[in-house]
A protein has these predicted regions:
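Membrane metalloprotein/metal-transporter helix-bundle signature
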Residues: 2-201
């Protein structure tokens, strides 16, 4: 357990180093608007929230280096997708890709996939393009692009941390029941993703 806690601390340290503090939001009006809108965008969409938390749960299930490498892969590739969105460079099937990400990542949690870290990083990276593009394409015209991007990157990283915290926290309650709770949650995410894909949600 001490090893897991040490790895989690390392993941938090990487997040703190990579992403900005709220001070970035006070450079000017455009910066404030950009950072706030960027931060709010991921947390106000159920599809984004479910996928981000699922990434954290997936990483927690894999453990070890995956605790920081998998979320870092998502945030990094998402930034590329965000640039594409801001630049108006099209990515096909963005909305479908986001919904499918909720389904697949939910299944990864529900079925407790034990993938190599590199494969898990590649999987989440594919889906990160869609999420990042959606964020970038919806940037307000009066927002600062840099601060907007930093805002949604920070919010995404925090949602990953929530997922990691849930995964590790629930695992402490018992080896028999805790995996089932996490698997049930993953299954619920996958079902929700199917609802998003079909337009029911």
């Amino acid at each position: 357990m001490s090893t897991r806690l040490a790895t989690l601390r390392a993941a938090l340290a990487v997040t703190a180093t990579l992403l900005p503090t709220a001070a970035w939001a006070h450079v000017g009006h455009g910066s404030t608007v950009g950072f706030v809108h960027g931060f709010v965008h991921p947390v106000t969409g159920i599809d984004h929230v479910l996928a981000m938390v699922a990434v954290g749960l997936f990483a927690a299930n894999l453990g070890g280096r995956a605790l920081w490498a998998v979320p870092l892969s998502f945030v990094s590739v998402m930034a590329v997708g965000g640039v594409l969105g801001v630049a108006g460079i099209g990515v096909p099937f963005v909305e479908a890709g986001i919904a499918i990400s909720v389904i697949v990542l939910g299944l990864a949690v529900a079925l407790r996939w034990q993938w190599p870290v590199a494969a898990a990083m590649a999987l989440v990276g594919i889906f990160a393009i869609f999420h990042g593009h959606a964020h970038g394409a919806e940037m307000p015209v009066d927002a600062s692009g840099l601060e907007y991007g930093l805002g949604f990157m920070l919010a995404t990283a925090l949602l990953h941390v929530v997922g990691i915290g849930l995964g590790i926290g629930i695992a402490r309650f018992g080896r028999t029941t805790s995996p089932r709770v996490i698997q049930f949650g993953g299954g619920a995410m996958a079902v929700a993703g199917l609802g998003i894909l079909t337009g029911v949600i």
